[in-house]
Amino acid sequence: MKIGIFDSGLGGLSVLNEALKKLPNEEFLYYADRKNVPYGLKSKDEILKFSSHAVKFLIDQGANAIVIACNTATSAAINELRAKFDLPIIGMEPAVKKAADLNREGENSASLRTLVIATPLTVQGAKLKELIERVDSEHLVDVLALPRLVEFAENENFACDEVKEYLREEFAKFKLQNYCALVLGCTHFNYFKDSLREILPAGVSLIDGNEGTINKLISELSRLNLAHGKGQSVEYFYSDAKIYDNGELARIGRYLARLNKMLEIK
């Protein structure tokens, strides 16, 4: 049993990290399309082409199920991918409903808002708009595109002054004291929880969709009786090339270590 996890780059490691904790006996194939990152500024047709290639590659490597660990690729391509390939394909969904539920439970639920941060394509896409319309009857959800965070993450620039300055400039457009939740609508954004926590008011919760995505995967594997691995392992690929280089594997290790540190920040 092999599970393929695909992202435009290294943001999807946050989804892999969640999967490693919840599926200790499965084999994983992680595909980072670093040749074409970032996806957030590309056209829908380009993303569909890249995503189709990635899924086919993972199937050729033996994947029995696919997780699209990329909100942008999910938004642009998941319907077409599910129609094209005959295996379970799980996508990402910004945790807007989770944020809305938390807001309703709060003491000031009538007045507090939710901010979704994502890539430009996700922000402009129909999938996010439909999700917000479905769960936000009171019109308390706003969206913000933060494309530079993907670039910062891919270059391993996490808590630097440039990142914090960028975030402060972008968040200055909003009265953050009026918000109760920040939804991370891009898997790359999980690397910046410390900087986000430093800038946001204490009452603003940081919410991502990783746990929900892996729970959906587990449910689907159980339904299809596919989860029967005998030991955990991970193979890494940059686009079509398997990673053997110790330097790159060490780099991936640093990313995973940072993600574990970020899990402590809410």
Curated annotation (Swiss-Prot):
Cystine connections: none
InterPro entries attached to this UniProt entry: Asp/Glu/hydantoin_racemase (IPR015942), Asp/Glu_race (IPR001920), Asp/Glu_racemase_AS_1 (IPR018187), Glu_race (IPR004391)
Residues given in the record as substrate binding sites: 7-8, 39-40, 71-72, 187-188
Keywords: Cell shape, Cell wall biogenesis/degradation, Isomerase, Peptidoglycan synthesis
Keyword match Cytoplasm: no
SUPFAM superfamilies assigned: Aspartate/glutamate racemase
Pathway stated in the Swiss-Prot or TrEMBL entry: Cell wall biogenesis; peptidoglycan biosynthesis
Keyword Cell wall biogenesis/degradation on entry: yes
Catalytic activities: L-glutamate = D-glutamate
BP GO terms, sorted: cell wall organization; peptidoglycan biosynthetic process; regulation of cell shape
Residue intervals passing through the bilayer: none
EC number(s) stated in the UniProt entry for this protein: 5.1.1.3
Gene3D superfamilies assigned: 3.40.50.1860
Catalytic center residues: 70 (proton donor/acceptor), 186 (proton donor/acceptor)
Molecular function via GO: glutamate racemase activity
Function recorded in the entry: Provides the (R)-glutamate required for cell wall biosynthesis.
Family of this protein: Belongs to the aspartate/glutamate racemases family.
PANTHER family from the UniProt entry: GLUTAMATE RACEMASE (PTHR21198:SF3)
Designated name of the protein: Glutamate racemase
Organism of derivation: Campylobacter curvus (strain 525.92)
